[in-house]
Amino acid sequence: MNQDREFTREDLIRFKPQHDTFVGIDSDGCVFPTMEIKQKQCFHKLIVSQWRLEKIEKYVRESAEFANLYSKYRGRNRFPCLLLSIDLIRNRPEVLASGVKLPAFTSLKKFIASGVPLGNPALEKLAGETGDEELASILKWSKDVNAAIAKTVKNVPPFKWVRESLEQIRAQADAICVSQTPTEALVREWQEHDLRDYVKIIAGQELGTKQEHLQMAAQGHYPAKRILMIGDAPGDLSAVQGVNGHFFPINPGHEEASWERFQKEAFKKFLNGTYGGAYEKALIAEFNQLLPETPPWIKK
């Protein structure tokens, strides 16, 4: 299989097991400490400039950081997080007082609800077919984000203990990268740090949701108890719950300790069948405590 090409949904559907165990692995914020630089220097900066929100940049950035980094929404696809970043400040007094008009994002809501894979190819097709100016502006933002990431995010090696963990996984399981990052960026980053050969497929946002990745590649091919997802966001947990598999959390802010625990303890438990139950529940409970659902400027 050509290691530098981008994969398709057919690759996931036709994925053939070589082991009786499957591991899905997220990338940004999980394998690589890239979320902060991507979000703060690329995503959020370009939200402000694309929709001329300079007057309220402080609040836009605060909201975008909450939505993308410091909440239970962390790790979701860029388009729902763009919508959420704006929706969370629509009624914020400081924003209302500024007089700045926020984008309505009516067409974005329809795109998100359409059921198509939420990536640039589907967005570009829809924007071209409809001539919708809002969709065109979102597509420009998304392409500009990709270009900024390609230019900015370099020489960011994986967290400590990742490589040792991937060595263990490759020897005893079939592994794929399961992400909502564009595939092009994933392939580039995994290749840059010589990690590409540890996974059989790199699945990004163009191939569907994380749960769809797992459904296509793992569900029905492996016993549910032999499916594991490693991730740093609640979306990773819900994705693997959708196929009744297990979850190992990479705790935000404690990533290296999480990977060390995986490498020295958790993966062995998963392989010998003692991972599920009290051990997994304790890890998930610890993980869930780290990420709030409501931003501090919204009263519960």
Kindly label every feature range from the protein language model.
Residues D4-R14:
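A short, compositionally biased domain-edge/stem linker segment
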Residues D26, N68-P80, G277-F287:
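A short, hydrophobic secondary-structure junction motif
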Residues E10-D11, Q18-D20, C30-E184:
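Alpha-helical substrate-recognition element adjacent to the catalytic core
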Residues K16-Q18, Y222:
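Residue-level detector of transmembrane insertion/anchoring sites
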Residues D4, I25-D26, C30:
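Non-catalytic protein-protein interaction scaffold segments in large eukaryotic complex-forming proteins
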